[in-house]
């Protein structure tokens, strides 16, 4: 690896204990110890790009998604094969009479019945063994807990703070002070904590004269109780089943209110190369309901009903900023009931198709 201080190419022996043997200065990460792609220069480079060279601040969660070296997701697989009990329950009643017939017969009949009995037993013994079903899952390398540990322990102990422009959004992090908004003109309803911290720390709601409301999708209706009904609502959510249903259900509950869906659309990530795909452990949502309520295509509804989802926090920060800005401006000029299911998706990029029938796998920024 390359020393982040003197740029010397270091062998394993020249970087023992995360200290450069040439300049004798410590560094935080070593790919050999902390995993592929985990080195100071790469983390700094990705953080600089994410913050637009210092113009924006980003969260540790956003940096984690951007610095991942691998992500993959797989759907559930049904059980297949025959249970041993069933195999022998069928085979023994057939094989036993044949063995008896062979034992008490002579000549050709004994040979044929004996061979048939052996064939039945052999088929039962060699039949495909039952493989239990497997639930879907996903994998991101490094894991979020591991990445946070590296940032909190190794990086802070080496440099005294997180990379420039990166803020902690963990559960123990202090709350971010939000710039005051005198008379808000709109509401931004955000269901992702990392994205809400990103918006607050960059003063985006105040700049747009919007009130930021953070809530889980299931609690979104209650979170809007204290918000004046005249204010338009811009909804930010993951590309998930609950996220896709949120804006349509809010429109039904508040027919006199502008509700603009600016969440991450499934069409932008389902077949997009490089998008992060994850699998939820929550009970599946019926595909028919997703089509009827959210107006999704058959393919998108099936993808979500299989448990797949994609996090809003994985969207590049500059793209996220531009989408939120455009969505609030659009909501301010819209009329109640005039927005359809596709409105709010106009600023999101279309997905780049991937070969059908393959496991969802994406790689993060180059690990070099």
PLM ranges: what are they?
Residues 1-231, 246-368:
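Nucleic-acid enzyme cleavage-core boundary/entry regions
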Residues 228-242:
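Acidic beta-strand-to-loop metal/phosphate-binding motif
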């Amino acid at each position: 690896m390359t020393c982040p201080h003197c740029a010397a190419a270091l062998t394993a022996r020249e970087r023992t204990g995360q200290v450069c043997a040439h300049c004798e200065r410590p560094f935080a990460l070593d790919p050999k110890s902390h995993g592929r792609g985990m080195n100071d220069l790469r983390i700094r480079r990705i953080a600089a790009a994410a913050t637009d060279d210092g113009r924006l601040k980003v969260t540790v969660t956003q940096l984690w998604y951007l610095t991942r070296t691998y992500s993959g997701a797989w759907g559930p697989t049904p059980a297949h094969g025959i249970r041993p009990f069933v195999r022998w329950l069928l085979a023994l009643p057939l094989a036993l009479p044949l063995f008896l017939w062979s034992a008490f017969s002579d000549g050709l009949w004994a040979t044929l019945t004996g061979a048939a009995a052996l064939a039945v037993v052999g088929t039962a013994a060699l039949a495909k063994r039952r493989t239990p079903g497997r639930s879907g899952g996903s994998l991101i390398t490094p894991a979020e807990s591991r990445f946070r540990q590296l940032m909190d322990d190794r990086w802070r102990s080496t440099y005294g703070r997180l990379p420039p422009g990166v803020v902690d959004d963990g559960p123990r992090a202090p709350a971010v002070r939000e710039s005051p908004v005198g008379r808000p003109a709109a509401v931004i309803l955000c269901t992702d904590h990392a994205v809400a911290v990103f918006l607050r720390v960059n003063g985006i709601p105040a700049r747009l004269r919007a009130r930021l409301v953070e809530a889980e999708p299931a609690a979104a209706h209650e979170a809007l109780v204290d918000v004046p009904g005249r204010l338009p609502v811009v909804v930010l959510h993951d590309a998930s089943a609950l996220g896709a249903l949120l804006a349509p259900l809010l429109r039904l509950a508040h027919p006199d209110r502008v509700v603009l869906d600016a969440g991450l659309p499934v069409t932008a990530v389902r077949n997009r190369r490089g998008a992060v795909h994850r699998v939820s452990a929550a009970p599946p949502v019926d595909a028919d309901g997703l089509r009827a309520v959210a107006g999704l295509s058959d393919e998108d509804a099936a993808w979500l009903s299989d448990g797949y989802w994609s996090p809003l926090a994985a969207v590049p920060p500059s793209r996220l900023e531009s989408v939120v800005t455009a969505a609030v401006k659009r909501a301010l000029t819209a009329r109640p009931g005039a927005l359809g299911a596709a409105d709010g998706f106009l600023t999101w990029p279309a997905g780049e198709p991937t070969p059908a029938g393959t496991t969802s796998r994406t790689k993060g920024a180059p690990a070099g």
